[in-house]
Amino acid sequence: MSKVTPQPKIGFVSLGCPKNLVDSERILTELRTEGYDVVPSYDDADMVIVNTCGFIDSAVQESLEAIGEALNENGKVIVTGCLGAKEDQIREVHPKVLEITGPHSYEQVLEHVHHYVPKPKHNPFLSLVPEQGVKLTPRHYAYLKISEGCNHRCTFCIIPSMRGDLVSRPIGEVLSEAKRLVDAGVKEILVISQDTSAYGVDVKHRTGFHNGEPVKTSMVSLCEQLSKLGIWTRLHYVYPYPHVDDVIPLMAEGKILPYLDIPLQHASPRILKLMKRPGSVDRQLARIKQWREICPELTLRSTFIVGFPGETEEDFQMLLDFLKEARLDRVGCFKYSPVEGADANALPDQVPEEVKEERWNRFMQLQQQISAERLQEKVGREILVIIDEVDEEGAIGRSMADAPEIDGAVYLNGETNVKPGDILRVKVEHADEYDLWGSRV
């Protein structure tokens, strides 16, 4: 009787942003297709892959700690992802790492796995890989990555040095993936990239094909096509180019979610110039006003940095004034943190940590008040909610205004007869600074 060879087992650690998560999903899909088993513990694994983040220093530290833990617990480790672009830094701390690759180096990662843990001779797992591939998100939503890299050279960021310049995926390929996701039961697609509004710039917005039909490689064309799938489509990381105006009518018509994630970073023209970001606050406020006139339901999310080198109290006050005027719905704020390799490190007038902390607190206090007022306006109204979790106490979902993990939630106490992915009409009964409570209509 022939001896059955056990399936080779791979452990996997995925760190960082949703874009990194998509890279992890792709590697895991390839591994499963080839017959590798993916296991949740170091002890059972023949090898561990760590997909790292290297965006800010705290993320670098977390990645180095994760690599160290994998080495201590298992011993055979391959490193990939953004921090992998800095091989010397990893080798200095962890010389025993077997191999290191940069971000989106899927083929190299698989070659290294094959070298240390040879492929199984037969493939009983092929039918277990779903058509849409392995997903690390809940079944009812998925991230759709449309491009790699970035053409901007913001002084606080090192993404281009790690992930390279913009490379747009062919639009036919993107739309085919979206269709597979919908066929697999996904109810919400979150479009992600380093710069979603630049989609197609690198290929001069050339015409691609989907189902035999010509489609322009652009954000607006992509949104028009995704709207035909009959699911929620949410846009993230939208740089404020003029053509962003063209997607607002699609939101007003209900074709894609009335949700725009635009990282504005600051409101002082001087600081924006130091950041190498576009800098007309008045124009931005005018656009926001115009967008809301076209699409009153529009939710605006943004992120800002306080304590950037050279930021004075006057600059910071301009930022607070902008918040008061813009009344954004969802806001993230970060204290400036030096990133190794970023141009901003060389700027004069670094802001003391205690000043950063004090400004961050003032920023958050103001935005918390604005957020509470914006949510209070929804009390008494009916909204659509997609369910994320259900337990014996009730259900937790999100409105069209809430992206997973970064925004608020809608709590439906006592609502147990639903399942994740269901979309309900809900009457809002209560609101606090970030979340809503309501009951099914």
Swiss-Prot record:
Record-listed [4Fe-4S] cluster 2 binding positions: 150, 154, 157
Cofactor info, note text: Binds 2 [4Fe-4S] clusters. One cluster is coordinated with 3 cysteines and an exchangeable S-adenosyl-L-methionine.
A GO-annotated cellular component: cytosol
Swiss-Prot/TrEMBL keywords: 4Fe-4S, Cytoplasm, Iron, Iron-sulfur, Metal-binding, S-adenosyl-L-methionine, Transferase
Residues in TRAM domain copies: 376-441
Domain Radical SAM core, first and last residues per copy: 136-373
Needed co-factor(s): [4Fe-4S] cluster
Compartments, as annotated in UniProt: Cytoplasm
Binding site for [4Fe-4S] cluster 1: 17, 53, 82
EC number: 2.8.4.4
Catalytic activity: L-aspartate(89)-[ribosomal protein uS12]-hydrogen + (sulfur carrier)-SH + AH2 + 2 S-adenosyl-L-methionine = 3-methylsulfanyl-L-aspartate(89)-[ribosomal protein uS12]-hydrogen + (sulfur carrier)-H + 5'-deoxyadenosine + L-methionine + A + S-adenosyl-L-homocysteine + 2 H(+)
InterPro entries in the record: Elp3/MiaA/NifB-like_rSAM (IPR006638), Methylthiotransferase (IPR005839), Methylthiotransferase_CS (IPR020612), Methylthiotransferase_N (IPR013848), Methylthiotransferase_N_sf (IPR038135), NA-bd_OB-fold (IPR012340), Ribosomal_uS12_MeSTrfase_RimO (IPR005840), rSAM (IPR007197)
Sequence ranges assigned to domain MTTase N-terminal in this UniProt record: 8-118
Pfam families for the chain: Radical_SAM (PF04055), TRAM_2 (PF18693), UPF0004 (PF00919)
Record note on disruption phenotype: Mutant shows a lack of methylthiolation of protein uS12 and a decrease in transcription of a subset of genes.
UniProt keyword Protease, yes or no: no
Matching PROSITE patterns: MTTASE_N, MTTASE_RADICAL, RADICAL_SAM, TRAM
Molecular function GO labels: 4 iron, 4 sulfur cluster binding; aspartic acid methylthiotransferase activity; metal ion binding; protein methylthiotransferase activity
Stretches of the chain forming a coiled coil according to its record: none
EC category: transferase
Presence of the UniProt keyword Protein biosynthesis in the record: no
NCBIfam families according to UniProt: 30S ribosomal protein S12 methylthiotransferase RimO, MiaB/RimO family radical SAM methylthiotransferase
The name this protein goes by in its record: Ribosomal protein uS12 methylthiotransferase RimO
Source organism of this protein record: Escherichia coli (strain K12)
